[in-house]
Amino acid sequence: MAANVKVLVVLALLQLMSLHAVVHGGDNGGVSAVATGKHEPKPKQGGGGGGGDGGCHISGFLHGKAGKCNRAHGSDCCVTGRRYPQFRCSPPVSSARPTPATLTLNSFARGGDGGGRSSCDGRFHPDTAMVVALSSGWLRLDGASRCNRMIRVAAGNGRSALARVVDECDSVNGCDAEHNFEPPCPNDVVDGSPAVWKALGLDEGVGEFKVTWSDV
């Protein structure tokens, strides 16, 4: 009788262990494996930008070439021989809700880290101007040219600001003088002037923030 009780106890323990493995996924898989798949590196999330890449994937690679790079505002300067991802698209924009993005900092002034003149109007803009650049897909490659249009940028602290789109954060080209010898942009960037950062109440020293933006 005692032997039968022991057998029943062992069987009960085995069932409990099996149930635990199913619920928690064991030591190596289950929930953590799903989480890993969910947060796989995307085309720089910026790639992928905030909120998912919407089917926008890397279209190629640019071979880096180092040069005279203005490192103001934490510029990521090209390294010779390194491969940098290129994107010919951006996450989809919906009129029903704001679009998640990564806000970066850029000077559009002459001699600033923005490189050449703004592509939309052929001008430089002082750091006090409320201006932004958008990743290539959002600026023009999704069929809706946003040059010289106004957008609203909203930060997680409850602040928002209106800014004019004056330039392209080029997601295809880079590592040359025109682009301050910086790599191509991720596909989900709103590159804002110091004035935009100030209006949003954000610390320039952080370098980038998750924000949303929408057409006005």
Swiss-Prot record:
It is found in: Secreted. Belongs to the kiwellin family. Coiled coil: none annotated. PANTHER family: RIPENING-RELATED PROTEIN 2-RELATED, RIPENING-RELATED PROTEIN 4-RELATED. GO terms for cellular component: extracellular region. InterPro entries: Kiwellin-like, RlpA-like_sf. CDD domains: DPBB_kiwellin-like (cd22270). Residues 1-25 form the signal peptide. It comes from the Eukaryota. The lineage of its organism: Eukaryota, Viridiplantae, Streptophyta, Embryophyta, Tracheophyta. This is Putative ripening-related protein 4. Keywords: Secreted, Signal. It comes from Oryza sativa subsp. japonica (Rice). The keyword Transmembrane does not apply.
